[in-house]
């Protein structure tokens, strides 16, 4: 490990160590599969896979005679076909068999048949948090989606409440503020008046509806109150006699009051609009929206005079026809259907989270009911009305209390739920069979739906992604990513600005910096460093508890909901050893407001300044001195750094480098403390101190030069010697882009900030030749080429060195089997695997058939179908793999074997490669200058790199200057620094270091021109900057074509490097040539170089023969236009001067010749 000097304003030690950075993946999958509990034979919790089985079983037959019951499941871990390494080699999936113990019970006879039933295979997670599917490492990204529960929001003039279940129908209530009516919508179908909906649910009288939502007051009817009564609403119906019936909810008129007085009604019950305050837990309302709806009912159903209430049939008919238009209706069915939509566990599930949110919102303690209750519906309506009246506030949809995270485990649980419901259906069908008594449990279960669902999820789901494996940081960040897209999430086009924006609840939970720059900005984010996901799927972040103004060491994890309205101090607030704050006013935040307050009001305090950003951003020193846009680019570009052959950790780090290396999974860590007894390049053996016997040893296999998903090189190197003592958890071997157990993505270079002869104009970079010679930025890239050997209709294909019409020079590189030898240097066009395919016999002449029968098979024709090195690729063959049917049982039908050849290429830094620092300062290498021509310092040291000073002011990433100043001091003092984010070294500290190292405190030096030896006119800022080489290499982008493939219909050259395509000559290029009057050039480009088929052949022929040429034919695109017009029924033909038809196709030519 490297000794680092802590240089910053804060304390070097943190109260809380960083958690394991990939625990979001590991914990989620462990919750799903509960492997640890299965191994230790402990009882399983009702979550993940266990909960799926418990919910589906028992499956009972229609008549109730037979039941299939679930006992337990287990994973056959010992029967794994391949190890992780073999899976990658052979293109297999790393998975185990899932078996379920089922009991088939015959309730009539009491007989029970038990069987362990095969339930398909289930992919296992590696210790690095990845899955290996078909030989490639994949990551299942966590999804952030809208939490189930209830939300209240406003769109234009509509106030809405929405109850979102985990599974089932959405229920929406909306108040139209122009008309003062309240409607309900189920699954976004037609609106239904709220009172009708309530009647359908059982509030069948006007009185019931009114007493549910309104406070009721009793008023004496007498001369004194006579004037106050008109205009008020009755809460209880009054029946004086046959034709004098006053309904609840009707407005009282002066005439009514007279009638009351005359008929001896002394007391009436009225709606009390002022008594809306919470009375013993009831939530009464103060607006007449519900009463308006009752009035609207009358208009909707023309009630016959004298009828007191709406008939149930009319209500059900109205509600049911809105929900299920066009379906036949019977009243009992209608009632049942409506009840099952929300109140049956089979059709509706709020989920734990939905119930938790509802209870939290309305102040209940119930956390178990998974379906809706009448109380939930009433409370939601009341709350919406209170918001409409202005007594309560709307919800913020983008608040992290309304968004939750679904990780691997939960996503897989949902996949299994869907598949198991299909299994259940099939089992029930099979149970209804007459011969059910002869059945065994395994005959009832169909595995197909499960296998296909799991396969489809891992292979094609938007959330199961090919792992970004450019370097360890890219790997780590990919596993910590949160994605708002995917099934059940948002879509790019419909996501507005608000969803993408930074919200105050993101503090400590999601990084405000790290997100892509393109159309996905803000939809794909990263987890903050200390953040974790709680049981409900909400993001939590840790805080130190502050009691009576004193900071304690007690830690609490708070979700966004818990944190609301709490007063939280920053991590760098000063306090003494007793925890007393030193200032009288401390900077705090309360929800989204930043203010100051006295220590006694503080509830919590941040645990660390880097709490609010992600791992990538926490690797940028002096982050707080950079503009946010550049910090974003810096975070993103560190993930694109190519692992180098000789990387070095940065002189100026942030302290996160060792944490990232440790948790990334690319280094080898000691499992137990002990002594190293063997250390070779490929293997380390440690004898643990607490070894039970002489054979109890820890063996570690070192990975050498393997290919990653992105064709970079995965190579581990040993850090320990034989006889060395190692501690548990100590890093004993480095991985790619790590050095001495620290992340090392690039190298430290001596920098001059100076324009140099225009070579570093516009972000271009000038580099010294020394860097190339010393291989500071040399990386190895490994490409895989594979070929299948198939069984064809005409016979099998063969791998052989005996290939027709191929020169001996090329065949010399192949071994006796026709496969390239390991260690051979190959160039484009070389054969890697010789393969011949039988040719179809087609129209063989009788003479040829005679020859075949005389000389046997020899004369049979074969076609050369060898695997060749594609254009633009060269390198050394480092490995060849042959995978046959004996090795793996599941090769595709018709495939006999697969051959894979690995070609490695050492790539030095060259002009056109992209480089970047950690502050978003990116550029392309424009010139590599000999060392002697580079500007040099007074002591003769030449610079390594020159950057343009104009790259700094407008970009506002001052961090790069501070880093290079401190780096310069560190290089000459032989020190490495930890400069934590948000607590960086001050200018005074940096200047102090520069003075100690013997430099000018401004780090400006006199530079000398390498060409003339003269000093430059002004002093130049000099420093040591950490630069990375990015995965945008010029070798992968350079491309040239002379002739190549053509598009089938238009016969024009294809486009793009992957298709070996040509350059497109677009409209603007044509205009330019027209403007020059370059007629012949233009004609050639638009015809023979593009899509004039006969012209292409003729011109090639003429060039070969050396004949001057001017061929012009008809371009194929003209023929396409002709055929399209003919498709419209317009026959178009062309005639020459003499009136003869010009043939456009060979077929036409034949027809003309015949006629």
From Swiss-Prot:
This is DNA-directed RNA polymerase subunit beta. It is an enzyme of class 2 (transferase). The RNAP catalytic core consists of 2 alpha, 1 beta, 1 beta' and 1 omega subunit. When a sigma factor is associated with the core the holoenzyme is formed, which can initiate transcription. Keywords: DNA-directed RNA polymerase, Nucleotidyltransferase, Transcription, Transferase. One of its GO terms (molecular function) is DNA-directed RNA polymerase activity. One of its GO terms (biological process) is DNA-templated transcription. One of its GO terms (cellular component) is DNA-directed RNA polymerase complex. It comes from the Bacteria. The gene is rpoB. It catalyses: RNA(n) + a ribonucleoside 5'-triphosphate = RNA(n+1) + diphosphate. Its EC number is 2.7.7.6. InterPro entries: DNA-dir_RNA_pol_bsu_ext_1_sf (IPR042107), DNA-dir_RNA_pol_bsu_external_1 (IPR019462), DNA-dir_RNA_pol_su2 (IPR015712), DNA-dir_RNAP_su2_dom (IPR007120), DNA-dir_RNAP_su2_hyb_sf (IPR037033), RNA_pol_bsu_bac (IPR010243), RNA_pol_bsu_CS (IPR007121), RNA_pol_bsu_protrusion (IPR007644). DNA-dependent RNA polymerase catalyzes the transcription of DNA into RNA using the four ribonucleoside triphosphates as substrates. Belongs to the RNA polymerase beta chain family. NCBIfam families: PRK00405.1, rpoB.
């Amino acid at each position: 490990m490297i000794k680092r000097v802590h240089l910053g304003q804060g304390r070097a030690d943190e109260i809380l160590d960083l958690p394991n950075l990939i625990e979001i993946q590991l914990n989620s999958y462990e919750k799903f599969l509960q492997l640890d509990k299965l191994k230790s034979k402990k009882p399983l919790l009702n979550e993940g896979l266990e909960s799926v089985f418990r919910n589906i079983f028992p499956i009972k037959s229609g008549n109730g005679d037979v039941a299939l019951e679930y006992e337990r499941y287990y994973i056959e871990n010992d029967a794994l076909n391949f190890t992780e390494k073999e899976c990658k080699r052979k293109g297999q999936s790393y998975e185990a068999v899932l078996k379920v113990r089922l009991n088939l019970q015959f309730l009539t006879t009491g007989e029970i048949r038990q069987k362990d039933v095969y339930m398909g295979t289930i992919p296992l997670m590696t210790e690095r948090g990845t899955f290996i599917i078909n030989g490639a490492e994949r990551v299942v990204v966590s999804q952030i989606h809208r939490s189930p529960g209830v939300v209240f929001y406003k769109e234009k003039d509509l106030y809405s409440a929405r109850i979102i279940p985990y599974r089932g129908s959405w229920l929406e209530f909306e108040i139209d503020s122009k008309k003062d009516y309240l409607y309900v919508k189920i699954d976004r179908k037609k609106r239904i008046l709220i009172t009708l909906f309530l009647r359908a649910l059982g509030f069948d009288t006007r009185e019931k509806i009114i007493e549910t939502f309104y406070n009721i007051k009793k008023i004496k009817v007498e001369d004194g109150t006579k004037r106050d009564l008109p205009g008020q609403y009755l809460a209880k119906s009054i029946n004086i006699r046959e034709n004098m019936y006053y309904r609840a909810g009707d407005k009282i008129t002066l005439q009514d009051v007279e009638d009351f007085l005359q008929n001896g009604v002394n007391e009436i019950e009225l709606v009390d609009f002022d008594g809306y305050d919470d009375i013993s837990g009831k939530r009464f309302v103060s607006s007449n929206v519900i009463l308006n709806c009752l009035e609207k009912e009358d208009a909707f159903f023309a009630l016959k005079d004298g009828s007191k209430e709406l008939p149930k049939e009319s209500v059900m008919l109205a509600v049911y026809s809105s929900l299920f238009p066009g379906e036949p209706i019977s009243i009992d069915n209608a009632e049942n259907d409506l009840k099952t939509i929300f109140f049956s566990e089979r059709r509706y599930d709020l989920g734990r989270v939905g119930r938790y949110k509802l209870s939290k919102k309305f102040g209940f303690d119930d956390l178990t009911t998974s379906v809706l209750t009448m109380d939930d519906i009433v409370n939601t309506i009341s709350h919406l009305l209170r918001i409409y009246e202005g007594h309560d506030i709307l919800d913020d949809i983008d608040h992290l209390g309304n968004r939750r995270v679904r990780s691997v485990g939960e996503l897989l649980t949902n996949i299994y739920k869907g598949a198991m419901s299909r299994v259940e259906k099939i089992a029930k069908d099979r149970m209804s069979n007459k011969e059910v008594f002869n059945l065994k449990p395994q005959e009832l279960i169909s595995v197909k739906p499960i296998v296909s669902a799991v396969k489809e999820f891992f292979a094609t789901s938007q959330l199961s992604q090919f792992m970004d494996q450019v370097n360890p940081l890219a790997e780590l960040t990919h596993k910590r990513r949160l994605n708002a897209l995917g099934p059940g999430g948002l879509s790019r086009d419909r996501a507005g600005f608000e969803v993408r924006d930074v919200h105050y609840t993101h503090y400590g939970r999601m990084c405000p910096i790290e997100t892509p720059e393109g159309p996905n900005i803000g939809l794909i984010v990263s987890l903050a460093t200390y953040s974790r996901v709680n049981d409900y799927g909400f993001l939590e972040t840790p805080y130190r508890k502050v009691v009576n103004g004193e900071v304690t060491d007690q830690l609490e994890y708070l979700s966004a909901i818990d944190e609301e309205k709490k007063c939280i101090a920053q991590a760098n607030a000063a306090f003494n050893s007793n925890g007393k704050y030193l200032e009288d006013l401390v900077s705090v935040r309360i929800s989204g407001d930043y203010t100051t307050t006295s220590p006694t009001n503080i509830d919590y305090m941040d645990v660390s300044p880097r709490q609010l950003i992600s791992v990538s951003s926490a690797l940028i020193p002096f982050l707080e001195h950079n503009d946010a846009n550049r910090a974003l680019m810096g975070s993103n570009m560190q993930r694109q750094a190519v692992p180098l052959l000789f990387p070095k950790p940065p002189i100026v780090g942030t302290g996160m480098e060792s944490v990232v290396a440790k948790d990334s999974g690319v280094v080898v860590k000691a499992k137990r403390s002990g002594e190293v007894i063997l250390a070779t390049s490929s293997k380390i053996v440690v004898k643990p101190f607490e070894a039970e016997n002489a054979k109890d040893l820890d063996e570690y296999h070192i990975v050498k030069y393997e290919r990653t998903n992105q064709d970079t090189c995965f190579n581990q190197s040993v850090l320990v010697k034989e006889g060395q003592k190692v501690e548990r958890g100590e890093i004993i071997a480095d991985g790619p882009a790590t050095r001495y157990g620290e992340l090392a993505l690039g190298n430290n270079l001596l920098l001059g900030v100076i324009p140099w002869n225009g070579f570093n104009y516009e972000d271009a970079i000038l580099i010294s030749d020394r860097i190339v010679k010393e291989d500071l930025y040399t990386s190895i890239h490994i490409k895989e080429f594979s070929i299948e050997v198939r069984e064809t209709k005409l016979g099998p294909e063969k791998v052989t060195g005996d290939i027709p019409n191929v020169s001996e020079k090329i065949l010399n590189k192949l071994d006796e089997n026709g496969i390239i030898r390991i260690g051979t240097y190959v160039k484009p066009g070389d054969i890697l695997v010789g393969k011949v395919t039988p040719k179809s016999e087609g129209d063989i002449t009788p003479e040829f058939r005679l020859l075949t029968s005389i000389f046997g098979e020899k004369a049979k024709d074969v076609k050369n179908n060898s695997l060749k090195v594609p254009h633009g690729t060269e390198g050394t063959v480092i490995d060849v793999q042959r995978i046959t049917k004996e090795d793996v049982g599941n090769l595709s039908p018709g495939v006999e074997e697969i051959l894979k050849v690995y070609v490695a290429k050492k790539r030095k830094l060259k002009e056109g490669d992209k480089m970047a620092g950690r502050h978003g300062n990116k550029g392309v290498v424009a010139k590599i200058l000999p060392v002697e021509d580079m500007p040099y310092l007074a002591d003769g040291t030449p610079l390594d790199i020159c950057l343009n000073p104009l790259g700094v002011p407008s970009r506002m990433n001052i961090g790069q200057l501070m880093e290079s100043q401190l780096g310069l001091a560190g290089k000459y003092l032989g020190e490495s620094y930890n400069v934590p984010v948000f607590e960086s070294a001050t200018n005074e500290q940096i200047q102090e270091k520069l003075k100690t190292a013997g430099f000018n405190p401004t780090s400006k030096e006199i530079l000398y021109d390498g060409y003339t030896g003269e000093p430059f006119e002004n002093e130049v800022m000099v420093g040591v900057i950490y630069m990375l080489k990015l995965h945008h290499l010029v070798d992968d982008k350079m491309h040239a074509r002379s002739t190549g493939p053509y598009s089938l219909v238009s016969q024009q050259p294809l486009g793009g490097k992957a298709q070996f395509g040509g350059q497109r000559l677009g409209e603007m290029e044509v205009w330019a040539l027209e403007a020059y009057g370059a007629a012949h050039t233009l004609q050639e480009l638009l015809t023979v170089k593009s899509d004039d088929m006969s012209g292409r052949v003729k011109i090639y022929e003429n060039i070969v023969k050396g004949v001057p040429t001017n061929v012009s034919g008809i371009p194929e695109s003209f023929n396409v236009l002709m055929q399209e017009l003919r498709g419209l029924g317009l026959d178009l033909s062309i005639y020459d001067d003499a009136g003869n038809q010009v043939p456009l196709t060979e077929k036409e030519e034949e027809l003309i010749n015949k006629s």
